[in-house]
Structure formats: C-alpha cells, structure tokens
C-alpha cells in the first residue's frame, strides 16, 4: 500500500480519524461521521433510504459534496452545481436511470428499491422473478491459483488467520477510536491449541 501511495505525485485523503492512508497524505480533509450528514444510504438489498444529520460536525469539518465542489472550483474553476446532499442525489438520478424515480420526497418515510426508473414506479423489491436474467444465469470464470507469498516453514510453522469481532468493524481503523467500544474490547487476543502453544 505504502509504495503505491508514495509513488503518487500528490495524495489527498478524507477521513474522520488518522489512518494508515492519512499517514501518507499530502493534504487531509477532515470528514463528517455518519451522524453528522444528511443524504442517502443504499444497502445490499438495493434499498435507497434517507439518512439525517443529528448533530453538526466539529470545527470546520464539511461534508464530501462541499469538499468536492470547492476542490473543483479552486483547481480548475469548475462548478459542479452542488448546493446540498439532495442536489448531489438529483444529479445522480439524471445519470443512473435505475434510480431516476427515487426522490427525497418519495423516500422520506420508507426507502425504495432500485431499479425505480420513473416517478410512478413502485420500486423493485424482487428482481428476476420470471427466472430470466438480463445476462443469462451466473457467469463463472476460471482463474489460476496464485500461491501465497509465504508458507509455513521450520522457523515459522504457523499461519495467522484473522477473524471478526462483535465490537469492532473491519480492522477497527475507525471503531478503535470509539471510547465505548474500546472499553468493551481494549485489546486483541490470540487463540492457539495447547499443543501448538508449547
């Protein structure tokens, strides 16, 4: 990761906490966290829902749309036309026809599932109900096996396999900064069989 980033002429990062990526950044823009923004959220069942800001971000933190808008203006004088999260969504509706019928008004109370191509479309809770698929049935591709860069040997006879923890999302890059979660699970643990531990 670091080598690729260091090879860049200029690297801008937007994040809510210091991370591995921000350590390489030439410029870091502080980001709003989930409770500090308005907008939409699309989950894995294709449901587009509204999210609402519950508190203002600290200091001079600005939402993503504002950062992009200002960067475009200052780098090449281009106005993206964004004035709010809703204006970004309206721009997306013009580009992504599968979401053209989803407006903030329509998802104020309950989300809609795309595709929803028109304003009178009810959304699509179930896709492919006829059994016919746009591209046919699942497309599988053969890939060649790439062996691991390192294998266990006499000096290092074990493999480390990481897993998930209830208290921390992903690799804890963001959740580790939550005092409450950190108090629940302050350090990692390793499980190993008694025989291997000897």
Residue ranges: model-predicted function:
Residues 1-59, 90-198:
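A cross-kingdom feature strongest in bacterial/archaeal respiratory oxidoreductases
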Residues 83-88:
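Short catalytic/ligand-gating loop segments at beta-alpha or beta-beta junctions
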Residues 65-81:
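Non-catalytic, well-ordered alpha-helical segments in soluble enzyme domains
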């Amino acid at each position: 990761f670091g080598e690729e980033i260091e090879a860049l002429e200029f690297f801008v990062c937007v994040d809510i906490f210091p991370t591995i990526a921000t350590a390489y950044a030439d410029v870091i823009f502080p980001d709003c966290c989930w409770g500090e923004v308005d907008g939409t959220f699309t989950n894995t069942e294709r449901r587009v829902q509204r999210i609402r800001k519950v508190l203002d971000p600290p200091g001079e933190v600005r939402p993503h749309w504002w950062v992009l808008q200002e960067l475009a203006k200052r780098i090449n004088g281009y106005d993206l036309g964004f004035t709010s999260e809703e204006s970004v969504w309206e721009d997306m509706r013009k580009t992504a026809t599968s979401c053209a019928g989803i407006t903030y008004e329509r998802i104020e109370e309950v989300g809609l599932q795309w595709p929803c191509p028109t304003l009178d479309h009810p959304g699509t809770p179930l896709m492919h109900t006829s059994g016919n698929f746009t591209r046919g049935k699942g497309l599988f591709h053969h890939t060649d096996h790439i062996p691991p860069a390192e294998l266990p040997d006499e000096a290092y006879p074990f493999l480390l396999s990481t897993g998930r923890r209830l208290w921390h999302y992903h690799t804890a890059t963001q959740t580790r900064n939550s005092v409450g979660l950190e108090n629940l699970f302050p350090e990692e643990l390793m499980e190993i069989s008694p025989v291997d531990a000897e």
